[in-house]
Amino acid sequence: MPSFDVVSELDKHELTNAVDNAIKELDRRFDLKGKCSFEAKDKSVTLTAEADFMLEQMLDILRSNLVKRKVDSQCMEIKDAYPSGKVVKQEVNFREGIDKDLAKKIVGLIKERKLKVQAAIQGEQVRVTGKKRDDLQEAIALLRGESLGMPLQFTNFRD
């Protein structure tokens, strides 16, 4: 039976490249020079600036560099800014994997449309199986059309 997996993966190399490009762009910006910094740790980035409006500009720089490197900005989880001495800091975490709630929502969407496919939750991915390839492509089109708050990829398509 044909099947495919619905996953949400983050390319860590592209993420580090985007953060490095954002750091280079910060060095070139005259209004932010020497006052702001990005610190990357695994799947989180800490933004440090002197004022809140600078944090907003830094977030825009980070988003634009993520888009240039083809990393979906929907996986960003932006936390509230907090003061730390004379500077203001903000954490940005990058989510990866499909959590239980999103997996249930995906399965519910597929069942709600009464497509001729079955969806099963397998850890951090959802396996969709069906009798025909066309049914699977219909399910892919359905999931691409929905905005679920996380970027989805479709892998392991088997005939």
Curated annotation (Swiss-Prot):
NCBIfam families: PRK05412.1. This is Nucleotide-binding protein PA14_57130. Belongs to the YajQ family. It comes from Pseudomonas aeruginosa (strain UCBPP-PA14). SUPFAM superfamilies: YajQ-like (SSF89963). Keywords: Nucleotide-binding. GO terms for cellular component: cytosol. It comes from the Bacteria. Nucleotide-binding protein. It holds the Pfam family DUF520. GO terms for molecular function: nucleotide binding. InterPro entries: DUF520, UPF0234-like_C, UPF0234_N, YajQ-like_sf.
